[in-house]
Amino acid sequence: MLNQFSRTQLLLGEEAMDKLKNSRVAVFGVGGVGGYVCEALARSGVGTFDLIDDDKVCLTNLNRQIIATRKTVGKYKVEVMKERILDINPDAQVNVHQCFFLPENADDFPFDEYDYVVDAVDLSLIHIS
């Protein structure tokens, strides 16, 4: 039966598609790089996302961020990206964490539950390690 991931399954195989569907990916920073990563992962069939960012879409994001449109300016990036992911794959689970990753809140994230972690943080002093 054809579904939205049929072409990807032809390329990767059923076992790989099951792994994607059952994987949980944390994306720290959903602006420029993180936005495109989320888009690609959603279109590839990843099942669960944790989106971490405390920034809002602003006018200066329009030239480079996939979530930035005139309609999304002023909205929190994690909420806009959640909506976009669910528009692409309504079966995905999307957990939003409206905060920045900082040393003070590092223990708030269940790193042992993530299959993959994307570090797309734009603050050079703070990176996921």
Show which residues each predicted segment covers.
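Conserved small/polar residues in nucleotide/adenosyl-binding loops
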Residues: 126-129
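Glycine-rich phosphate-binding loop and adjoining beta1-alpha1-beta2 segment
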Residues: 53-88
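N-terminal charged helix/coil linker that caps or initiates catalytic domains
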Residues: 1-26
